[in-house]
């Protein structure tokens, strides 16, 4: 028989996808099957870590859950945003009363910005080749 997982949320940002499981616990972190002291050990950049755990901070649930995260695609910045949305959605499964707080800080909104495709005849998505008058 499978063990009880807890609360689940999926988050996406750019090309990153995160599946987040919250289990009642004391704040352990497991990312892609590997144990970490904190999320900072995975993301390295403190700004990305702070961004990812923001939903736990604003809802005062920081030490109440163990995080089990499967994240792939994109870079660390996009993964941080995906984890953030996944945690916020999992917290809603835990308690619907947290919705106004999470909504106030815009944590339930999927950031729709994606990389614009490169067009032919241009060097990048919008950058045209250098123009010479003479």
UniProtKB/Swiss-Prot annotation:
Single Gene Ontology MF annotation: structural constituent of ribosome
Annotated keywords: Ribonucleoprotein, Ribosomal protein
SUPFAM superfamilies in UniProt: Ribosomal protein S5 domain 2-like
Pfam families: Ribosomal_S9
Coiled coil segments of this chain: none
GO (cellular component) term, any one: cytosolic small ribosomal subunit
The keyword Cell membrane is assigned to this record: no
Domain of life of the organism encoding this protein: Bacteria
Transmembrane segments: none
Segments of skewed composition (Basic residues): 120-134
A GO BP entry: translation
Region: Disordered, residue numbers: 113-134
Gene3D superfamilies reported for this sequence: 3.30.230.10
Family affiliation: Belongs to the universal ribosomal protein uS9 family.
NCBIfam families (alphabetical): PRK00132.1
Name this polypeptide is given: Small ribosomal subunit protein uS9
Species of origin: Thermotoga petrophila (strain ATCC BAA-488 / DSM 13995 / JCM 10881 / RKU-1)
Source organism phylogeny: Bacteria, Thermotogati, Thermotogota, Thermotogae, Thermotogales
């Amino acid at each position: 028989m499978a063990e009880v997982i807890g609360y689940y949320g999926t988050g996406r940002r750019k090309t990153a996808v995160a599946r987040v499981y919250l289990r009642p616990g004391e704040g352990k972190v497991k990312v892609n099957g590997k144990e970490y002291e904190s999320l900072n050990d995975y993301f390295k950049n403190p700004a990305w870590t702070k961004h990812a755990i923001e939903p736990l901070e604003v809802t005062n649930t920081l030490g109440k859950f163990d995080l089990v995260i499967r994240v792939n695609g994109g870079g660390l910045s996009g993964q941080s945003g995906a984890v953030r949305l996944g945690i916020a959605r999992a917290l809603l499964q835990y308690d619907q009363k947290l919705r106004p707080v999470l909504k106030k800080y815009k944590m339930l909104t999927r950031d729709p910005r994606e990389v614009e495709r490169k067009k032919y005849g241009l060097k990048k998505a919008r950058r045209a080749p250098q123009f010479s008058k003479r």
